[in-house]
């Protein structure tokens, strides 16, 4: 795993203390994956250059584990939106790949606002989660890339004992994980 790699196109997998998966951040490293910086960093957990990768073309980060700017990435097209996200499945502002609902109507994925949140000890800026149904608190408030997945047309999940916190709006997370269906 690359230093401070991300999964989910922008959600950091870095833990606190500079641990990135099983690797500790080294003095220098080069991240070249789609959702990573493309330049060699003086400290892989403290990049200071403007990111130009395909998934983070205009992001400026003070820490690879702590993005501070709103993303305009190909993988997170709704992140410029910090408020006014849609509040219902398929109501305006939706983006492709809909599903056929129980009534037979096509229901598109919809943008949902995600407030400032804590992710593995680091902060993420306000963003939107693309979902067909209202995302869970786990997804909105504790959206750890290693634990949670966004809701794709109603299919949401959390890996057990990993996502939800005592202050979570929802009392428990799903005990098992499920795969997106669309």
Swiss-Prot record:
The keyword Repeat applies. Residues 27-86 are annotated as: 6 X 10 AA tandem repeats. Pfam families: Keratin_B2. Keywords: Keratin, Repeat. Disulfide bonds: none annotated. One of its GO terms (cellular component) is cytosol. Coiled coil: none annotated. Sequence repeats lie at residues 27-36, 37-46, 47-56, 57-66, 67-76, 77-86. The keratin products of mammalian epidermal derivatives such as wool and hair consist of microfibrils embedded in a rigid matrix of other proteins. The matrix proteins include the high-sulfur and high-tyrosine keratins, having molecular weights of 6-20 kDa, whereas the microfibrils contain the larger, low-sulfur keratins (40-56 kDa). This is Keratin, high-sulfur matrix protein, B2D.
